[in-house]
From Swiss-Prot:
The lineage of its organism: Eukaryota, Metazoa, Spiralia, Lophotrochozoa, Annelida. Disulfide bonds join 2-131. SUPFAM superfamilies: Globin-like. Belongs to the globin family. This is Extracellular globin-1. Residues 1-142 form the Globin domain. It comes from Lumbricus terrestris. The extracellular hemoglobin of the earthworm consists of 12 subunits that have a hexagonal bilayer structure with a molecular weight near 3.8 million. Each one-twelfth subunit is composed primarily of disulfide linked trimers (chains A, B, and C) and monomers (chain D).
Amino acid sequence: ECLVTEGLKVKLQWASAFGHAHQRVAFGLELWKGILREHPEIKAPFSRVRGDNIYSPQFGAHSQRVLSGLDITISMLDTPDMLAAQLAHLKVQHVERNLKPEFFDIFLKHLLHVLGDRLGTHFDFGAWHDCVDQIIDGIKDI
């Protein structure tokens, strides 16, 4: 469960880690490099957006769509009704793409790794795990 105080901390830490403009592109590259290096099988579901080349404009745009979706959901952590509606919308999109539930767990693992690298000693792993678990559980088709 993502407590109110955890949600507020996650929002603040996300703003710091995700940054602005080019920092967001770099965040996406770091995240997807780790995911695809350890799990090359994940490239296949992303063939439509050039999952074979994370430096392509198509994959860069996809990366920013994913991270913007995460950004929106994080911004709604303190508005449960809005968050529930957003998660329902995202779930439909992800179910249509037939993404395996374990892909979400892989995403979470790598997201937490990148956040830890960027936030250092300020990173609250527990708060992030609780809040992003809530987001992911609302999206993935279990």
